[in-house]
Design a protein with these regions (language model features):
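N-terminal amphipathic, basic-rich helices that act as targeting or association modules
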Residues: 2-131
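Cofactor-binding active-site loop characterized by glycine-rich and histidine/acidic residues
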Residues: 91-94, 98-225
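A short, hydrophobic C-terminal helix/tail in secreted or cell-surface proteins
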Residues: 226-231
Length: 231
């Protein structure tokens, strides 16, 4: 009986098409700014936004200029304010990571590369709106006026910590900014946000709730399990 030929094991290491310093090409992106229409955010139906969930909403052209119906038409002052918050967040993250690596903090998570997500969206909110963050959205507190010293006090867990050491580091809470406490279990922010949104609707309040999701949350039971109505 002939021996089975062993299958050769190979290792594939993916590499980025462009490295820092290279001129990137965005030719594979076929969408142009404005290819996906911008529906009325109040009156649109779910079917009108299906392509937006699976497609690419482009605001910037290849030269970095905003155009099309998704252009927010920000003023230079608004752009500078957003950039200032993002740079501050990057510097804050770098300093706190050094503290964690040298044993001065027990735990820390950066928002590296995601600074604009929370900061830009929080800038678009009204002051009465609620924020239900994850670990990656601490920059929203800068927009709402929280100072870095207060955030550092929380991460260290010292006597000036506004939650008195009852939370892990980077589990911020900021009552004045309607920034709800970060939860350790991922995915819980969705049910919290929905609950507050429903309460606001019952009371006819002019408020909205915003929350975020990442790969971890989208894979957890709280997010993927069907509701009793779906059973």
């Amino acid at each position: 009986m002939a021996a089975k030929k062993k299958k050769q094991v190979t290792l594939h290491v993916p590499s980025a098409p462009f490295r820092p310093g290279d001129k990137a090409s965005f030719a594979p992106f076929e969408n142009e700014p404005g290819d996906l229409p911008r529906p009325n955010p109040i009156k649109c139906t779910a079917s009108e936004t299906t392509d937006h969930a699976y497609g690419l909403v482009r605001v910037l052209d290849f030269d970095g200029n905003a155009s099309g119906p998704w252009d927010p038409e920000l003023t230079p002052d608004e752009l500078r304010e957003g950039l200032e918050h993002m740079v501050r967040m990057r510097i804050f993250d770098d300093r706190m990571m050094k503290m964690q690596r040298t044993g001065k903090l027990s735990f820390y998570m950066r928002s590296f590369g995601e600074e604009a997500v929370a900061i830009a969206q929080t800038m678009a909110l009204e002051n009465q709106d609620w924020i239900f963050p994850t670990y990656r959205q601490p920059g929203a507190q800068f927009v709402r006026g929280r100072d870095m010293v207060s955030m550092i006090n929380h991460c260290i867990g010292n006597v000036e910590d506004n939650v008195k050491g009852r939370q892990m580091p980077v589990h911020y809470t900021y009552r004045d900014g309607r920034f709800i406490s970060v939860s350790s279990p991922v995915g819980t922010q969705f049910s919290q946000a929905v609950g507050v949104a429903m309460a606001s609707q019952y009371k006819a309040l002019d408020e909205c709730c915003i929350t975020w999701i990442g790969d971890g949350s989208s894979a957890c039971l709280l997010y993927t399990s069907p509701s009793p109505r779906d059973s």
